Amino acid sequence: MTHAFYAYASYGFAALVTIAVTVWTWADARRRRELAALEAAGIRRARPRARDGE
């Protein structure tokens, strides 16, 4: 193993992490926009109903 291998591997790993965080952030923003649109249309998230006697 050479120094260059470790350097390139670390740059590659950093690039993968950066891409993963970018995709995750993009997907989360998209999901939040979809939820906001549903709530604006009057559709709310389902909540579990309480059982009788509990």
Swiss-Prot record:
Per UniProt, the keywords (alphabetical) are: Cell inner membrane, Cell membrane, Cytochrome c-type biogenesis, Membrane, Transmembrane, Transmembrane helix, Transport
**Its membrane topology:** Single-pass membrane protein
GO-annotated biological processes: cytochrome complex assembly; heme transport
- Which InterPro entries is this protein grouped with? Haem_export_protD_CcmD
One Gene Ontology cellular component: plasma membrane
Report TM segments. Answer: 7-24
Q: Which family does it belong to?
A: Belongs to the CcmD/CycX/HelD family.
What protein is this chain from? Heme exporter protein D
Q: Which organism is it from?
A: Rhizobium leguminosarum bv. viciae
Lineage of the native species?
Bacteria, Pseudomonadati, Pseudomonadota, Alphaproteobacteria, Hyphomicrobiales
